[in-house]
Curated annotation (Swiss-Prot):
It is an enzyme of class 7 (translocase). This is NADH-quinone oxidoreductase subunit H 2. Its main location: membrane. It comes from Rhizobium meliloti (strain 1021). Its EC number is 7.1.1.-. Belongs to the complex I subunit 1 family.
Length: 328
């Protein structure tokens, strides 16, 4: 009986996380448009619903009812598979993400995570790296020069940024002496890691912008020179899946930043519930992603490569050496 209850709890957690992640782009697209309107001294969406709150629903209905166009020369199987490959990895990663310790429900302790892996950090980097295959297959299968160029840029961008991103968290692992995300958060009960690892945080967050393919590092879908990059030929529900994937990765990078460098659900000064602290921190970094989009220009391709190899990689290596000397 206990086994059945435990399995039921796990299934409920998985279903809840999937439902939240699928619905999350709706409020985020509305928020991003409102932020854009505020920064450009206009009102943003106002027509559909009160202050445009139903605009994302209208956009979703529009995408679901549009023609699912497949180019005549495309590889149909890979073209259909690519959006799923882009969407699945960030969803799987959330299975190892803790949102808190536990809560009491009807006298039972319910943990706020699906799985507590001892090597959760390694699992996160291994799985999130698979997302790039969806982008590569989507661009190549479309048989379009703009889409292929977008895919090639994604390959180069991933190599340039995932290496320093991985190196940036080694200092955090040294401090916590564990690769478990729960242990990393518990190690920040008194002092957040960003105090000891400012260089690691800088490298991780900048590389995270590239990982999420957000401005100023959205070279794979640069509208000015590639139309829409790897998803130029996509429409309807398949295009929507790529958009959901982009927003989920943005939230994932924000969550990882909070867990690794900003104490997770550990608060300061103000006595708020741990889960609320966690959500407020994540919301701040999500807002920062959106603020960057309407503040910074897009880097050129050669500039993006130079930042990855000549700036972030040396900084991440220097951070490892400094951390090893200071915390050994």
């Amino acid at each position: 009986m206990e086994l059945i209850v435990a399995l039921g709890v796990i299934v409920f957690k998985v279903a809840l996380v999937i439902a939240i992640l699928l619905l999350l782009p709706l409020p985020l697209t509305w928020l991003e448009r409102k932020i854009a309107g505020h920064m450009q001294q206009r009102m943003g969406p106002m027509r559909v619903g009160w202050h445009g709150l139903l605009q994302p629903v209208a956009d979703g209905i529009k995408l679901l009812t549009k023609e699912d166009h497949i180019p005549a020369e495309a590889d149909r199987f890979l073209f259909k598979l690519a959006p799923i490959l882009a969407l699945a990895p960030p969803f799987v990663v959330f299975a190892a993400i803790p949102f808190g310790e536990s809560v009491s429900v009807l006298g039972n302790e319910i943990t706020l995570y699906i799985s507590n892996l001892n090597v959760a950090l390694l699992f996160v980097f291994a799985v999130i790296g698979l997302e790039v295959y969806g982008v590569i297959f989507g661009g190549w299968a479309a048989n379009s020069k703009y889409a292929v160029l977008g895919s090639l840029r994604t390959c180069a961008q991933m190599i340039s940024y995932e290496i320093p991103m991985g190196f940036a968290v080694i200092g955090v692992v040294m401090l916590a002496q564990s690769m478990s995300l729960l242990d990393i958060v518990r190690a920040q009960t008194d002092v957040w890691n960003v105090v000891y690892q400012p260089i690691g945080f800088f490298v991780f967050f900048v590389a995270g912008l590239a990982e999420a393919q957000r401005i100023p590092f959205d070279l794979a879908e640069a509208e000015g020179d590639l139309g829409a990059g790897f998803h130029t030929e996509y429409s309807g529900i398949r295009f929507a899946l790529f958009m959901v994937s982009e927003y989920v990765v943005m939230v994932l990078v924000s969550v990882l930043t909070v867990i690794l460098f900003f104490g997770g659900w550990n608060g300061v000064l103000i006595p708020l519930p741990p889960l609320l602290w966690f959500l407020l921190k994540v919301a701040f970094f999500v807002y920062l992603f959106m603020w960057f989009r309407f503040t910074f220009p897009r880097y050129r391709y050669d500039q993006l490569m130079a930042i990855g190899w000549k700036v972030l990689l040396p900084l991440s290596l220097a951070n490892i050496i400094i951390s090893g000397v200071v915390f050994s």
